[in-house]
Amino acid sequence: REKRPDAVILVGTPTWSQEIDKAAESPLEDKNVMYTLHFYAGTHKDDLRNRLESYAQNGLPIFVSEFGMCDASGNGANDFESTTKWLDLLNKYQISFMCWNLANKDESSSVFRANSTKISDWTEEDLSEAGQWIKAYFKNRSYQ
């Protein structure tokens, strides 16, 4: 805090950053703290969404520092319907989020296909199913 008093500090929460209720019960005494939440749309559904909404409505500063469109293993089928519900909720409360994972590992959570070896100038063919979906999501979103 001495060097950067206005810097935001992201604080993880228990159980893979899903228990934001623990942060709400005993928040840190600092003006620039946000509590992290992780979700995987194929696994985490209404229960975690409802918990997030409850604490967001009460002003808990939340940042989704990891989310995937598949199940919590990082692999398995993508659930784009659940992903859409999640992102709609995050946008409703202006909660920032980061997609997992920017990799070419042969898993459904990877944004790139396993055979993509580029480090820039990616094409649609370099993107996995998840990568194509998230690209289309941001491309088609209206920004205010």
Where in the sequence are the language-model features?
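Extracellular glycoside hydrolase catalytic/binding regions
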Residues: R1-S96, W100, S109-Y143
